[in-house]
Amino acid sequence: MKRNRFIAFFLAFLAIAPAVARDVLPVTGSWINLFYQDERNKYSNPMDMDNTDPVMWRAKVREMKALGIEYIVFMATANDGKADYPSKLMPLAYDARRESPVSAIIDEAAREGMKVFMSIGWAENQDDNLRNPAILNRQLAIMEELAGLYGSSEAFYGWYLPVEDCLGPVLTDAAVVAVNKLVERAHKLTPGKKTLISPYGFFCCRFDDPNFAKQIMRLKVDIIAYQDEVGCVREEFPMPRLKNAWREMKKIHDRTNIEFWGNCELFSWEKGTNSRQSALVPAAMPRVLSQLAAATEGGVSRIISFMTPGIWSLNADRFPLGQPEVSERAAQEYLAWRNGDRTLKLLEKSLTGTLGSNTAAIASVAVKNGDATFLTDGITGDENPENAAWKRFEAGYNEITVNLGKADTGSIFMRLLNCAKRGIGVPYKVYIYTAGDDGNYSLAQIKEMAQHPNSLHDTWIEPLLIEWSTSVKSIKIGFQSTTPLLIDELYLR
């Protein structure tokens, strides 16, 4: 009887205990692009570099490993009728006296214990249309040739099928037929190997249409890694809609045997969006972190990305792929988060709703000419400046004063919205004044907030961490900015 009472108590406890959020998943897979196709590849595959150098690609594989990448996905193994592997179907895109880029990458991946998805594109180029029987048959021939060359490699994990069709509003019959035909051939050529697709169109999916789920369930593919389209900016503020899309797609995948992965885009645009005349450049780390948090909370089992090589860079001195300086900084900021950087970890917790605040220790919060209760009400905004949780501070100098109940050491974490396209930025200087029991303020520190260069199209939540190691009773935070500011919450730690 005692045992039964204990079980009943334990089950009751589980019913009332707060849910524990999953740890935000890191990026463990990435596409790798071998060819310069247009201006989008300006930094990832520079025209003035030898993009067929096997030494470079081996170095990039090791770099991917250092970033925590386990899965490498070839974007394409051929382009414009030339192959980056020892093909008998078409001419070579590299010097035949050297190791091919594809061979170098898959061999180095095997050495590093990584897994590779081989691409069967392009039959012609990045505009391959699988509704054309000649294109489909050519991709099948490429698959057969690649299976013979690399099917026995330790690193060969499966196939990436570049069937970049649109999910929405409902996946077409033609797309389903094309995918399933490729999957059938792949499983016949390489039994036990996985097949992967990564469709776009999350922003226009009709989840309320019963045919939408039916079409997904008809697919015979092993893995779908959905493009989150945040980098592509298919809508002005994609994050609020994206969170719901992940949840809805998870419900569908729970009724299938298809693995549910996320493809979180790491890039932004140097000029216009979705243009072949605009280079891909690194997105700000807070934007990327929000994408990872949304995909994790949406239930994906793994996050892969387009893409780390040429967007993030760890070997810029020898092989300078990526936007100068910015790609290096992006890689270091990502690794800082992986290694527990406090500011980014606090942002992560705030994004997942698991960041607590010691509001009981705050006696009062004040702002000039306004109500400051919003700063400690526990209500946070999303990546949309029209969300009512964001409170506006005009350009110039603004102050927030936090009075503690008693003198203590600690830290304050704040969230600001960065939305350059709406004229909302972050302060270029933050002044921290502290006071003890006597109420006399003195300047304790000045923080400079980095202004990310690739803010033309994106909106993200910018973290600000203020720490003090001496016992203080009041903190005054001054912001100097040339644009209006949006702030939603203040956390006392």
For each feature predicted by the language model, list its residue ranges:
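Boundary/entry segment of secreted carbohydrate-active catalytic domains
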Residues: 22-70, 75, 201
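Aromatic-lined substrate-binding rim segments of carbohydrate-active enzymes
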Residues: 54-123, 174-195, 239-242, 248
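An active-site-proximal structural segment forming one wall of the substrate-binding cleft
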Residues: 97-112, 131-158, 215, 295
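Active-site groove signature of glycoside hydrolases
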Residues: 121-127, 143-173, 304
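Aromatic- and acid-rich polysaccharide-binding/catalytic face
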Residues: 154-167, 200, 209-240
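Substrate-binding cleft of secreted/luminal carbohydrate-active enzymes
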Residues: 228-235, 258-344
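Short beta-strand-plus-loop segments that form exposed binding edges in beta-rich domains
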Residues: 477-484
